[in-house]
Regions:
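Helix-adjacent hinge/juxtasegments
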Residues: 78-120
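N-terminal glycine/threonine-rich, aromatic-flanked beta-hairpin/loop signature
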Residues: 55-93
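Short, surface-exposed coil-to-beta transition loops
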Residues: 56-60, 91-96, 118-122, 140-144, ...
Length: 183
């Protein structure tokens, strides 16, 4: 199969139609809940490896404004591009989340898409004290993703799962993010 030449051109219109430089004026205060993360980050991942043993890896994370500044999209890559194990399931992941503020529920709707491991999950996110908590309870296992220890140049992301309808939660993984400085 041949890829059409138009699709491979960097100026094909897709990037310009998707990405914007900042938030939309409407709900700008609410948009900054995730807008504060716009930029590039280095990740230190810790979790359980494919063999069931504790594992660590480094990766990368990129946040940007999309869809007219009404949403924030991110790309999580662990291990990072060019690192051993990149793109090799089940331990690696390379996925994207699109999040937008929905004033009808005063919360963020969020969808995670991760083709390496064939995952799609929907979440609802809200501020929780100084943290941000995202909950996915439409299918098993239920998931809780938390942004915590949030500062201008670092944060921690934690993932937990419940296999009993939310009665108990098990730690799955954690990522420490450090903002990249302009190079």
């Amino acid at each position: 199969m041949t890829i059409p030449t138009e699709a491979t051109r960097p100026d094909n219109g897709f990037i310009g139609a998707l990405h914007v430089s900042g938030p939309a004026d409407e709900h700008v205060d609410k948009l900054m809940l995730f807008g504060q993360f716009v930029g590039s980050w280095d990740l230190e991942w810790a979790g359980t490896g494919a063999n069931g043993e504790p594992a660590t890896a480094t990766g990368e994370l990129h946040f940007g404004w999309v869809l007219g500044g009404r949403a924030v999209q991110d790309i999580w890559i662990v291990p990072g591009r060019g690192q051993p194990g990149e793109g090799q399931p089940p331990s690696a992941f390379h996925g994207s989340t699109i999040r937008f503020y929905d004033p009808s529920i005063d919360a963020w709707r969020s969808t995670w898409v991760e083709p390496v491991n064939c995952r799609v999950r929907r979440f609802v996110g809200r501020p929780a004290g100084g943290d941000i908590l995202l909950v996915s309870d439409e299918e098993d296992p239920q998931l809780r993703w938390r942004f915590t220890d949030i500062g201008p140049d670092s944060f921690t992301w934690q993932g937990k799962a419940s296999h009993d309808g939310g009665r108990t939660w098990v730690f799955e993984e954690q990522m420490r993010a450090t903002r990249r400085r302009s190079r």
